């Protein structure tokens, strides 16, 4: 019981420091590494390449554009049991919000292992892990603040003060 509570405490601690915002795709199943890192290497074939492009509201000039590309493949096929699978993959995502006001880029690597539960490998249990290096950039020259709007119109000057740390953020997730 003590081990259970220790494991639960570790999981809660990890979840509390995690930061994630996944891009939204209408055909999310076509971007397996974006959807779930446990899907890495889970396919029939030698390798898999996936690419997605999403342009939300294309008639509006301040649209949201999201692009992804991923490559994954199975590894150690001759060293694992025939019913087991292991895969590695890489993923790249770029997301432009509001005509480039907020740009998010990240690249990641993923690893997954699938253990066969029966003699044919029809039933498997798998786990996947993914780590990403994320970069967010805010272009404050394109942002409009409340103090820039006066009864006489748009002044173009703001009293907001930004540091480079607020404009460019890099982190590992």
Predicted features along the sequence, with ranges:
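Subset of outer-membrane beta-barrel
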Residues: 21-173
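Bacterial Sec-dependent N-terminal signal peptides
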Residues: 1-24
């Amino acid at each position: 019981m003590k081990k259970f509570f220790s494991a639960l405490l570790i999981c809660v601690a990890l979840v509390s420091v995690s930061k994630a915002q996944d891009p939204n795709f209408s055909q999310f199943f076509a971007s397996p590494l974006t959807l779930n890192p446990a899907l890495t290497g889970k396919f029939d074939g030698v390798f898999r390449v996936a690419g997605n492009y999403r342009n939300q509201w294309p008639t509006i000039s301040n649209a949201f554009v999201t692009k992804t590309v991923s490559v994954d493949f199975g590894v150690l096929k001759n060293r694992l049991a025939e019913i087991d699978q292991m895969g590695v993959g890489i993923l790249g995502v770029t997301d432009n919000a509001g005509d480039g006001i907020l740009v998010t880029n990240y690249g990641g690597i993923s690893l997954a292992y699938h253990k066969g539960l029966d003699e044919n490998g029809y039933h498997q249990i798998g786990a996947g892990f993914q780590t990403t290096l994320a970069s967010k950039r805010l272009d404050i020259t394109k942002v409009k603040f409340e103090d820039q709007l006066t009864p006489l119109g748009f002044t173009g000057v703001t009293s907001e003060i930004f540091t480079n740390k607020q404009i460019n953020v890099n982190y590992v997730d």
